[in-house]
Swiss-Prot record:
<comment type="function">
    <text>CIPK serine-threonine protein kinases interact with CBL proteins. Binding of a CBL protein to the regulatory NAF domain of CIPK protein lead to the activation of the kinase in a calcium-dependent manner.</text>
</comment>
<feature type="binding site">
    <location>
        <position position="42"/>
    </location>
    <ligand>
        <name>ATP</name>
    </ligand>
</feature>
<dbReference type="Pfam" id="PF00069">
    <property type="entry name" value="Pkinase"/>
</dbReference>
<keyword id="KW-0418">Kinase</keyword>
<feature type="region of interest" description="Activation loop">
    <location>
        <begin position="154"/>
        <end position="183"/>
    </location>
</feature>
<dbReference type="InterPro" id="IPR008271">
    <property type="entry name" value="Ser/Thr_kinase_AS"/>
</dbReference>
<dbReference type="GO" id="GO:0005524">
    <property type="term" value="F:ATP binding"/>
</dbReference>
<feature type="binding site">
    <location>
        <begin position="19"/>
        <end position="27"/>
    </location>
    <ligand>
        <name>ATP</name>
    </ligand>
</feature>
<dbReference type="InterPro" id="IPR018451">
    <property type="entry name" value="NAF/FISL_domain"/>
</dbReference>
<dbReference type="InterPro" id="IPR017441">
    <property type="entry name" value="Protein_kinase_ATP_BS"/>
</dbReference>
<dbReference type="GO" id="GO:0007165">
    <property type="term" value="P:signal transduction"/>
</dbReference>
<dbReference type="InterPro" id="IPR000719">
    <property type="entry name" value="Prot_kinase_dom"/>
</dbReference>
<feature type="region of interest" description="PPI">
    <location>
        <begin position="334"/>
        <end position="363"/>
    </location>
</feature>
<comment type="similarity">
    <text>Belongs to the protein kinase superfamily. CAMK Ser/Thr protein kinase family. SNF1 subfamily.</text>
</comment>
<keyword id="KW-0067">ATP-binding</keyword>
<dbReference type="InterPro" id="IPR004041">
    <property type="entry name" value="NAF_dom"/>
</dbReference>
<dbReference type="Pfam" id="PF03822">
    <property type="entry name" value="NAF"/>
</dbReference>
Length: 454
């Protein structure tokens, strides 16, 4: 913590200097007291969010970051709230923006530009594979860490699969003018993947050449240049770099190179080492927790027993929190359910394993959790369908079972959850996939009862 920069303790975090400010609040440096870890806490003013009608944007950013776990995407670790503020605990990236780096040092060498572009494409491609389109990619939203590696940030304008129209295309104009794809400006449907690729091409141009490919003080003239793809690519760039830029900055999206084409391009392939996403089970993310009072800061999860949930966490998991308006998602129960059970953890794990095995799943036992895997049709990957199972102790006779899908078909996930919850004495499937109130669950805790769906 920087001297003179200490502030009040906040739910287990010691707050420090302000890193930046935006429309809805500020971002502060924070240190986690239990681990000493460094984080960036985005503090949003709920009144400001409501007055600017930005609830959907904030909700979208949270919902998006919950899905993404990749070395080149900024990680969301925790979300909490008070009556007046929303707190997003994010990965701390201490190298600043790519924009600042280029503004200060100028254009990058082809070798360095290629390395960063490979990381950018790895991160963006990972997002696309999960149905997430950024829609506002620019150097200001690409951070650089202390080791010189990039992290994609600011997913407030991103789109998820449920935002697609009946034609399978996106229809909302988003993004920054200089980086926006021509098809997005036409107010017609557009492919989110191809529009993101265009923005990546503009970023590559800026990295290698040092200025924008499309720029003009007059916004109409700027848009005309973008529509025409009217830009000059210097001859001093290597032939293969020129070729890739032209293929990305193709104004006709039907002719534009796609993600697979970029990854197989000779310029991109040089010294390319693909980066693997994080294991989805590496670390869980906590959502919906009410901001602890100052005297509660030592009551942190995992201090004494990684299997136990304290009363504060239990309240945070319930659906009756003020946060519901920000964190509810119609698709969320298709990825994770939790229900209460009276079975001891060992017996619960045995029952889960038995139910999953009978349905043809492979079961791997790890520390305090099970991994349930099944090969789906058309895939040779044994992890093409994967669900993790955990059991948390609420008390001597009440536990919480969590089933969380990492990959795979929602219908198969629903079938698996129905079987396991039924075998453990829970209520019917429709109730399992609905969010129940905390009070009802505690009153019915003698049987397996759904507690919440995150």
């Amino acid at each position: 913590m920087v001297k003179g920069g200490r502030e009040a303790l906040l739910g287990g975090y010691e707050m420090g200097r302000t890193l930046g400010e935006g429309n809805f609040g500020k971002v502060k440096y924070a240190r986690h007291l239990a681990t000493g870890g460094h984080f960036a806490v985005k503090i949003l003013d709920r009144g400001r969010v409501v007055s600017l009608r930005a609830g959907d944007q904030i909700r979208r950013e949270i919902a998006t970051l919950k899905l993404l776990r990749h070395p080149h995407v900024v990680r969301l670790h925790e979300v909490a709230a008070s009556k007046t503020k929303i707190y997003m605990v994010l990965e701390f990236v201490n190298g600043g923006e790519l924009f600042e780096r280029i503004a200060v040092k100028g254009k990058l060498s082809e070798k360095e530009g290629r390395r960063l572009f490979q990381q950018l494409i790895d991160g963006v491609s990972y997002c696309h594979d999960r149905g997430v389109y950024h829609r506002d990619l620019k150097p200001e939203n690409v951070l650089v860490d202390q080791k010189g590696n990039i992290k994609i940030s600011d997913f407030g304008l991103s789109a998820l699969p449920q935002h697609l129209g009946n034609d399978g295309l996106l229809h909302t104009t988003c993004g920054s003018p200089n980086y926006i794809a021509p098809e997005v400006l036409q107010n017609k449907g557009y492919d989110g993947s191809l529009s993101d690729i265009w923005s990546c091409g503009v970023i590559l141009y800026v990295m290698l050449i040092g200025y924008l490919p499309f720029d003009d003080r007059n916004i109409v003239v700027l848009y005309q240049k973008i529509f025409k793809g009217d830009t000059q690519i210097p001859k001093w760039l290597s032939h293969s770099a020129q070729n890739l830029l032209r293929r990305i900055l193709e104004p006709n999206p039907m002719k534009r190179i796609d993600m697979a084409g970029i990854k197989s391009h000779e310029w991109f392939q040089k010294d390319y080492i693909p980066v693997l996403p994080y294991d989805d089970d590496d670390e869980d993310v906590q959502f919906g927790a009410r901001l602890p009072a100052k005297e509660q800061i030592n009551d942190e999860p995992g201090d004494k027993n990684s299997h136990q949930i304290n009363a504060f966490q239990l309240i945070g998991m319930a659906s009756s929190l003020d946060l519901s308006g920000f964190f509810e998602d119609e698709e969320v129960s298709q990825r994770r359910i939790r229900f209460t059970s009276t079975h001891p953890p060992k017996d619960a794990f045995d029952k889960i394993e038995s139910s999953a095995t009978e349905l043809g799943f492979q079961v791997q036992r790890g520390h305090s959790k099970l991994k349930l895997m099944r090969n789906c049709k058309g895939s040779k990957n044994p992890e093409s369908f994967m669900v993790s199972a955990e059991v948390f102790e609420l008390g001597p006779s009440v536990n919480v079972v969590e089933l969380r899908k990492s990959n795979g078909d929602p219908a198969l996930y629903r079938q698996l959850c129905e079987r396991i919850s039924s075998d453990m004495g829970a209520r019917n499937t429709e109730q399992i996939f609905a969010t129940a109130s905390l009070e009802d669950d505690l009153q019915n805790s003698n049987a397996g009862t759904p507690l919440f769906a995150l």
